[in-house]
Amino acid sequence: MCRKFLGIFCSVAVLFCFSPSTSLAELVIVSTDQGWEFSTDGMVNLFAVTSSGDERPDNVNNGITLGDGNDSFRLRSGFLPGVLAFNVKAPTTNGLDMGARIGFYPNPQNANTKNSFSAQIDLREIYFTVDGTFGQFLLGKTLSLFQGQNTLTGMTLMGTGVSAISGGGTTLGNIGYGYIYPQFNAQIRYTTPTRYGCKLAVGIYDPSVIASTGIEAGVTKAPRFESEASYTGDFNGLSVKTWISGLYQTAEFEESGDEVEANGVAGGLALG
């Protein structure tokens, strides 16, 4: 548990702050008369972080945050790594808009070792979309629905949040302090059109083993299911966003064949 975490450089050095996922402008490199578009977006960030930690409470398994007496200074990425992404949009055909995105997410630091080659480059996004009056179908890898909005609306998204001493990856933000990490996973997702500020998204996902300390149900015979219902509106200049998401999956123990299930429900409210 971190007692304090301070980003000395609280500003983010942005080379390209053009992300379609945040409805900002893109840098369009190629646009043809036939309607094809190629664009790129990205971001670079680096924080100076000094941290100290308190003693971990009892019964904490696999704790990776700072412990008692752990003081640290790092030059590192924050909760978000860097971003370099490429987008392709096809011309509208029979009312359908099709596109694809591939996103690389590198971190600037090594794992607290000068001559290490451990800086991570995450291939977090690679997906294809089809949009129409029916809504959107997405196939590929991107952020999961369950607790995804909890991550995207977190106050540490563009900052640092909870960190550990070493490591070549990002900080934890607020992960473990009210929500778990949704992760970027392979999926087939359908999202309805927005009606009166409301929309629903449902998806089938590449399943995961269901495990705890010393035990694992590793036989996955069915996909994982995730969903999210959300509402966005404006009341006298006050923007309101609320959501609820869910997850369900089963797995079996290899030797006994016994089945276990994992399920969860999460929600949130954001005012701006």
Task: Outline where the language-model segments fall.
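Bacterial N-terminal signal peptides that target proteins for export
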Residues: 1-9
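Outer-membrane beta-barrel translocator domains and adjoining extracellular loop/strand segments
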Residues: 52-65, 110-123, 152-155, 207-222, ...
